[in-house]
From Swiss-Prot:
Alphabetized Pfam families for the sequence: TALPID3
Tissue: Ubiquitously expressed. Expressed in photoreceptor cells (at protein level).
Gene for this chain: KIAA0586
Residues bearing the modification Phosphothreonine: T1042, T1046, T1063
Function noted in UniProt: Required for ciliogenesis and sonic hedgehog/SHH signaling. Required for the centrosomal recruitment of RAB8A and for the targeting of centriole satellite proteins to centrosomes such as of PCM1. May play a role in early ciliogenesis in the disappearance of centriolar satellites that preceeds ciliary vesicle formation. Involved in regulation of cell intracellular organization. Involved in regulation of cell polarity. Required for asymmetrical localization of CEP120 to daughter centrioles.
Disease: Joubert syndrome 23: A mild form of Joubert syndrome, a disorder presenting with cerebellar ataxia, oculomotor apraxia, hypotonia, neonatal breathing abnormalities and psychomotor delay. Neuroradiologically, it is characterized by cerebellar vermian hypoplasia/aplasia, thickened and reoriented superior cerebellar peduncles, and an abnormally large interpeduncular fossa, giving the appearance of a molar tooth on transaxial slices (molar tooth sign). Additional variable features include retinal dystrophy, renal disease, liver fibrosis, and polydactyly.
Region spans: Required for centrosomal localization: 467-554
Annotated keywords: Cell projection, Ciliopathy, Cilium biogenesis/degradation, Coiled coil, Cytoplasm, Cytoskeleton, Disease variant, Joubert syndrome, Phosphoprotein
Protein name: Protein TALPID3
Phosphoserine PTM sites in chain numbering: S406, S1050, S1066
Composition bias type Basic and acidic residues, residue spans: 309-321
Subunit structure: Interacts with CCP110, CEP290, CEP97, KIF24.
């Protein structure tokens, strides 16, 4: 513990009472006044009573010697007091002020919380003003009367005065009783208030009486306490007197033995009376203090605290002046023979040492002293006693004589010892009774007793023989052991009481004062800790500085030339540092004074020696750092360094061990204003250091060039600057310099940073820097990326080459290390010391300073490197630019640790660089793969238009679940760009698709198509499961490209012909057979396909399975609807067959359908936001299309039929989360359908007004179509819904009427037009379908769904075809909701935007059925069909070529008879026009085309291939599917 701290612990009142003490105790030398306990806190009485026996004995023992030199001791004591007291007073005052600055409310915690809550409520909520109207009975009556009279008067219009008077009289008459009542109430209230006032008065009186009683009781208690205290004081005085008598007796006995022993030597006691007088004097002054002692716990605690501090202070003071006694004497000096005197002196010296030791022990822990003052006093006394006894025993043997004391004397000693023990025991018992106030006094008095017998024994032993001494030793040991036991017991009791009292006091303070006291204590403790730590550091730093000064002075003499050079550099550095780096003035000045002077005078060789020595000494390192900071200023990048940890250069360049110590130091430096803008440092250096560089160049030649060759050579002058060059090199300031002047500025920065060094760097760099370049390049490259990005981009350009230099530098730095050992390298040491000293220096604290100081040197070296690096800039410029800072750091790094260490960081950096390169390469590879895949697909499928829509489909499939917006962007022509150009609408989707699906896609496109075609049913089932998961997006992408050729075929006239041709009737039959056999599987496929078609347009892949899946998608409803559609869609299947190769055609019809679906996806995107829950089921369906993509290969013919059927089914599947097999789909679909059907009732109405409800209903549908719609028109979708509603609003009236009144007629007309519409589907869908979809679907949803669903149910139930329409009705119901939402979302805009590339394809296939149903029902069949024709034509025009695969879906009511009655040709042509209910359902179906946007309103003129086959097959498949799905259809329905 520093002495200063302990001195400051002295009580505040020392100075005040110093004079008083001198007056009161004229005989006591002032030095003892420190031992005098002064009042603490209240100051009501002196606490001297609490001081220990050591204080009394010290008064006795020091009495004579102090009297000899009273003036000296007095003056010394006064000085000590001045030193001790003033700082304490100042500190306490400051503490008080600080404590006062903090105002702490005296609330309980609960109250505080309540207040906080109230304040928060007030602050958060504006005051709510409540107007409370008091309704008095009188006023109320008057008001009522007045109102009634006014009402009467106003109608009558009588204004005459008589009427007014009558009214007033009536009012008075009516109010009179009320007034009376009020007066009565007032009288009663007054009486009550009087009673209350009386009660309050009585209460106050009672309170006063109680207060008086309590005050009297308290006074009595206080008096009793005072009496008790007085009694205790008297008792204590008596005991003390008794103890004094015992002490006198013991002293007499001792003197008797001594005199008997000394008789032979003719020495006689001379000073006994004086010693007794001293004892009396020293002991008695305590008595008045005892009487006056205040029993309050606080005073006792303070008294305990103060004496300890004072004792310690006196011991330190005594150490200072030999005249003052080191510790209070415990025994009066007795004349003894020379031997005895020597032994006494030895004992006194030992006691002094013991006291000093104890004082030091006490100083070790300030907090412990404060908390355990009494304990520390007793411990000191015990330790001193025990040590004195042991030492005295050692001293006895040489002093032993042949004299034997008489037995009586031994007995008397035993008796006295027993008495003293008994007295101590009695005191212990009585102390238990006494208050805590008396305890310290007794303990102190008890401490006195053990001391006397010890001394007496010592005196006795001197004259006794060995045998007598042995016996005496035994007796004394027993007595001492007893004493120790008693004292320990007493101390334990005292500690327990004192601790309890102290803790209670602390708790009381903490509880009563709450945080204020705690905060104050914390502040004081923190201040003590800070001051103590600062003092310790100051002392250490002083010694280190002194040693450094001495070493530097010795080195100064060695080289005068270097001194002059160093002085020049130092002066310049000082100017730079002052401008650049502000510091604490006191520390900065001192450090500069210590560092700059020696540094200037230090020769290079001496500096190296100092560095070696300084590395061992943290203080030297600190000086070097400070000096470096002063000379070089903080590195521009020091802020980054701080983040990097200690030195950025160290951090980048080499092993963490060395760089780590520096980094924290750098951080410390960084905390200050050390780091300044690069401009200031570089500019400042650029202005001045250039001149310095010229000087430096001159000085550098003086230094050996071997050192200069290394990059460190520029730092030669840096070593000359000061031993801190080690620190400079360690900080790796050069790296910072490079980073600061990253490029063109690098040479000036070097000049600036290491003012002398820049010249050396320039001169010596060419060889060394080149070498360094070769070695350092690697680390720089890795490092470059680390820092270059953080720092100036211009630096990046300059330092691109430096990275190469850094590699060479790392090698050269290793070389530099060897020259460093030579004195020549003294100039180089800034760099060399980087390597050597940095290891030690980094660990040292000086590194904090070094980074700043080395910054300049390092910058110089870096500049050299940069210059050299500039030559090899041609190498990795990009990396070097990034690593400009890194280069500088790496350069420093290699020297600081060995080159190998630098390579390690470079390896990490290189790893990062390699990772970045790999990421870029991977991205490039992926892009190239995408390009190649796009080209391969385009080559395989020559129709690029088809590729684009297929790509869009794949994108929509993958992106719809992810983001429908991407689908929108890609759904139009952008998809092909997306794949071909490698510009991803959704790069993640493309990458995922390409990476995961390349092999699968190629296999599927080339080989799997046919295989899948062969086994469509099985694949359909598997596809359902797999696609339900996330499998679809990956595969769908590849299948999508395969169907691409079909969309172009569909847009092409042959595609339309194919739709009409319906050549693949057999394939629909196959599909029908499949339906009959794998109704569930196909339905599952189709359920999957439909959502897939919605999202991905994958249903094209599963054309064969589609007809059954359409029926089975939603086992009940899909089976019916899908079968109906399949009947009609069977003609559509021939379209893909006719369009091109059956496998490709299947996929192609799928792809056109998929394209339509992606548009639907885009459409649905806008709705996805609203119906997320619905969309999620839809998203699972998109995976489903993946298997369907393979399936279409197997089921080529059915795919077209599937597409229309799949539209409703997909809508249904989207409605229901269940994308699994048909059975599982049935339940969820039924639930979803029921919900949607209910919602659909509301949806059309809401959509008509808002268009929001359909969006919610479309949640399930949103999977594909919904996402696509939302993609295209998220914001406009609502507006478009409104537009659609407006356009469709007219159609709604028509649709509603048509549905309700002309379902069959409309369906037939729609069918008739659908044939024509195939060509004009796009036109009507774009121009008019949105109207029909928005308004017509709304009406259809509301009216037809509920008006006609029973009809469709009956039809579907009655006929095998109809049951599927039922399922499909449900499907369409869900789909219709979806379509309505899609239309509402702005099928116009979506149709306009997406129908051109993709949505048209989707609309004709999947949505045509629902769209035609909706259109046919709401609009006059001809008009609506015309609209559809126009829409279809538009769709075809807008690269909706897949329109060929449009399914003409009639209302189910119409479809059932029409399908049964209509010839295959009619079936092909007949649009599947559902009943108004089915139209509602297909309004959901429209959702898909609506996603295409315009197609839903237009009838989907979907030519189902081979309607007859489907009619037959569907009848079978319907029967089977109805069996499977009809029940579920009925349930769901």
């Amino acid at each position: 513990m520093p002495v200063k701290r302990l001195r400051e612990v002295v009580s505040q009142n020392h100075g005040d009472h110093l004079v008083l003490l001198k007056d009161e105790l004229p005989c006591v030398p002032p030095a003892l006044s420190a031992n005098k306990r002064l009042p603490v806190g209240t100051g009501t009485s002196l606490n001297g009573t609490s001081r220990g026996s050591s204080d009394l004995t010290s008064a006795r023992n020091c009495y004579q010697p102090l009297l000899e030199n009273p003036m000296v001791s007095e003056s010394d004591f006064s000085k000590d007091v001045a030193v001790q007291v003033l700082p304490l007073d100042k500190i306490e005052e400051n503490n008080k002020q600080k404590a006062n600055d903090i105002f702490i409310s005296q609330y309980t915690m609960g109250q505080k919380d309540a207040l906080r809550t109230v304040l928060k409520q007030k602050a958060q909520s504006m005051p709510v003003f409540k107007e409370v109207k008091v309704h008095l009975l009188e006023d109320a009556g008057i008001e009522k009367d007045a109102v009634t009279q006014e009402t009467r008067i106003s109608p009558s219009g009588i204004d005459s005065a008589t009427t007014v008077a009558a009214a007033t009289a009536a009012a008075i008459a009516t109010a009179a009783p009320l007034i009376k009542v009020q007066s009565d109430l007032e009288a009663k209230v007054n009486s009550v208030t009087e009673l209350l006032s009386k009660l309050q008065e009585t209460d106050k009186h009672l309170q006063r009486v109680t207060e008086q009683q309590t005050s009297i009781q308290r006074k009595q208690e206080k008096l009793h306490c005072h009496d008790h205290e007085k009694q205790m004081n008297v008792f204590m005085e008596q005991h003390i007197r008794h103890l004094e008598k015992l002490q006198q007796q013991q002293i007499d006995i001792q003197t008797h033995f001594i005199s008997a022993a000394l008789k032979t030597s003719s020495f006689q006691p001379v000073s006994m009376p004086s010693s007794r007088a001293v004892e009396k004097y020293s002991v008695k002054p305590e008595h008045p203090n005892l009487g006056s002692c205040n029993p309050s716990l606080y005073n006792t605690f303070a008294s305990k605290q103060a004496p300890l501090k004072e004792v310690e202070d006196t011991s330190f003071d005594k150490q200072k002046s030999p005249l003052e006694t080191p510790a209070p004497r415990r025994f009066a000096p007795v004349p003894v023979s020379r031997d005895d005197e020597l032994s006494k002196r030895e004992n006194l010296l030992e006691e002094k040492e013991n006291m000093e030791v104890s004082c030091h022990r006490g100083n070790v822990r300030l907090l412990e002293q404060i908390l355990n003052n009494n304990d520390s006093l007793t411990r000191k006394s015990e330790s001193s006693n025990t040590t004195s006894l042991t030492r005295s025993k050692i001293g006895w043997t040489p002093e032993k004589t042949n004299r034997f004391p008489s037995c009586e004397e031994l007995e008397t000693t035993k008796v006295t010892m027993q008495k003293s023990d008994d007295v101590l025991h009695d005191l212990g018992q009585k102390e238990k009774e006494t208050n805590s106030m008396v305890q310290p006094k007794e303990s102190l008095s008890m401490l006195k007793l053990p001391d006397l017998p010890q001394n007496s024994v010592k005196l006795q032993t001197t004259n006794t023989t060995r045998s007598v001494l042995k016996d005496a030793e035994k007796i004394l040991r027993g007595v001492q052991n007893n004493k120790k036991v008693l004292e320990e017991n007493l101390e334990a009791i005292i500690r327990a009481k004192d601790g309890a009292a102290m803790y209670s006091l602390i708790n009381a303070l903490s509880t009563n004062r709450e945080m204020s006291e705690k905060i104050r204590i914390r502040k004081t403790v923190d201040e003590w800790i800070k001051t103590i730590s600062a003092e310790i550091q100051d002392e250490l730093s002083r010694t280190d500085y002194e040693q450094k000064r001495f070493d530097q002075k010795n080195q100064r003499t060695k080289k005068g030339q270097n001194m002059t050079k160093d002085i020049r550099t130092n002066t310049q550095d000082k100017t730079v540092n002052k401008s650049v780096i502000p510091r604490k003035h006191s520390q900065k000045q001192i450090e500069e004074h210590f560092r700059n002077l020696p540094m200037r005078g230090m020769p290079a060789s001496s500096l190296q020696k100092e560095r070696k020595e300084g590395l061992l000494k943290a203080t030297t390192v600190i000086q070097d750092e400070d000096y470096m900071l002063q000379v070089y200023g903080k590195p521009v990048y020091q802020g980054h360094r701080s983040t990097l940890k200690k030195g950025p250069y160290l951090r980048f360049n080499s092993p963490s061990p060395k760089s780590r110590p520096q980094r924290p130091k750098v951080i410390e430096r960084v905390k200050g204003t050390k780091v300044k803008s690069i401009r200031t440092q570089t500019d400042f250096y650029a202005t001045k250091p250039k001149k310095m560089d010229s000087k430096m160049k001159h000085s550098v030649p003086v230094l050996p060039h071997g050192d200069q060759q290394y990059l460190f050579s520029p730092s030669r002058e840096m070593p000359t600057f000061s031993g801190t060059l080690e620190g400079h090199l360690i900080p790796m300031a050069i790296l910072l310099g490079q980073t600061q002047s990253n490029s063109d500025t690098m040479p000036p920065a070097g000049v600036i940073v290491s003012k002398p060094h820049p010249v050396t760097v320039t001169t010596s760099i060419p060889p060394s820097s080149r070498k360094v370049e070769t070695g350092v390049k690697k680390p720089n490259i890795a490092i470059v990326e680390m820092k270059s990005e953080k720092k100036d981009p211009p630096q990046l350009t300059v330092q691109v080459l430096p990275s190469v230099d850094i590699d060479s530098i790392s090698n050269s730095s290793a070389d530099v290390l060897s020259p460093l050992s030579s004195p020549k390298e003294a100039s180089l040491p800034p760099v060399q010391t980087w390597i050597k000293t940095p290891e030690i220096m980094k660990v040292d604290e000086e590194e904090v300073k070094f980074p700043g100081t080395n910054f300049d040197e390092i910058i110089d070296v870096i500049q050299e490197e940069e210059k050299c690096d500039e030559i090899p800039d041609s190498e990795p410029i990009l990396e070097f630019n990034r690593s400009v800072k890194a280069d500088s750091t790496k350069y420093n790094g290699p020297p600081f640790p060995p080159v190998a260490s630098t390579f390690q960081p470079t390896a990490d950096i290189l790893d990062k660089v390699i990772e970045r390169k790999e990421t870029l390469e991977n991205s490039l590879i992926q892009w190239v793969e995408q390009e190649i895949m796009s080209r391969i697909i385009s080559g395989l499928f020559p129709v690029q238009q088809q590729i684009a829509p297929s790509i869009s489909v794949s994108v929509s499939e993958t992106s719809e679940p992810l983001t429908s917006d991407i689908v929108e962007g890609t759904s139009s022509g952008a998809l092909q760009l997306f794949v071909d150009a490698g510009v991803p609408v959704n790069s993640n989707v493309i990458k995922h698709f390409v990476n995961e699906a390349l092999a699968e896609t190629i296999a599927v496109m080339l080989g799997d198509r046919e295989a899948k075609k062969q086994g469509p049913v099985a694949t359909g089932v598997s596809g359902d499961a797999s696609t339900n998961e996330t499998y679809l997006p990956a595969r769908v992408c590849t299948p999508l490209p395969t169907p691409q050729p079909t969309p172009p075929c569909s847009p092409s006239s042959p595609a339309k012909e194919c739709v009409l041709v319906k050549t693949p009737d057999s394939s629909p039959c196959d599909s029908d057979h499949d339906m009959a056999f794998p109704v569930k599987e196909i339905c599952a496929e189709k359920g999957d396909d439909m959502p897939a078609i919605m999202l991905v347009n994958t249903p094209t892949v599963t054309p064969t399975t589609t007809p059954p899946p359409a029926a089975a998608v939603f086992t009940p409803t899909l089976s019916d609807i899908s079968i109906d559609k399949l009947k009609v869609s069977s003609p559509e299947l021939p379209k893909p067959w006719g369009d091109g190769d059956l496998p490709l055609e299947e996929e192609n019809p799928n792809s056109p359908q998929e394209e339509l679906h992606p548009r639907a996806i885009v459409m649905s995107v806008a709705k996805d936001e609203e119906p997320e829950s619905m969309d999620f089921p839809a998203q699972p369906p998109p995976p489903e299309p993946v298997p369907f993509m393979p399936f279409p290969a197997g089921t080529k013919a059915p795919s077209p039929s599937q597409m229309p059927g799949s539209d409703s089914s997909t809508l249904e599947s989207t409605l229901s989360v269940t994308v699994t097999e048909t059975e599982t789909l049935d339940k969820p679909i039924s639930e979803g359908e029921i919900l949607f059907s209910c919602g659909q009732k509301l949806a059309p109405k809401i959509l008509e007004d808002i268009g929001l409800y359909l969006t919610n209903l479309n949640d399930s549908l949103s999977s594909t179509l919904h996402d696509a719609v939302e993609m295209e028109d998220d914001p406009p979708s609502e507006g478009q819904v409104i537009r659609m509603s407006h356009k469709k609003f007219h159609a709604d009236a028509i649709l509603s009427f048509a549905k309700q009144n002309q379902e069959s007629a409309v369906s037939q007309q729609a069918v008739y037009h659908s044939e024509d519409l195939e060509n004009s589907v796009g036109e009507l869908s774009e121009g008019q379908r949105p109207q029909l979809t928005a308004a017509a679907e709304n009406i259809l949803m509301g009216h037809s769904l509920y008006m006609q669903p029973p009809v469709t149910n009956t039809q579907s139930l009655d006929q095998q075809c109809d049951p599927k329409p039922l399922s499909r009705q449900f499907d369409t119901v869900s789909g219709s909701i979806y379509e309505d939402s899609c239309a509402s979302h702005g099928p116009m805009s979506l149709g306009e935007l997406e129908l051109e590339p993709n949505s048209k394809l989707v609309l004709p296939t999947t949505l045509l059925t629902a769209q035609e149903n909706d259109v046919n029902l709401p609009v006059a069949a001809e008009d609506f069909s015309q609209y559809q024709l126009k829409q279809n034509q538009d769709v075809k025009q807008v690269e909706h070529k897949p329109s060929q695969s449009y399914l003409r879906v009639r209302n189910k009511s119409d479809i059932a008879p029409s399908q049964q009655q209509v010839s295959p040709g009619d079936m092909d042509r007949t649009q599947i026009e559902l009943n108004p209910y089915l139209t509602c359902v297909f309004s959901g179906g429209k959702a898909v085309p609506l996603s295409a946007s315009q197609m839903p309103p237009a009838k989907m003129s979907v030519m189902l291939p081979s309607v007859n086959l489907e009619d037959c097959s569907q009848s079978l498949s319907l029967s089977t599917m109805q069996e499977d799905m009809e029940s579920s259809g009925a349930d769901t329905f």
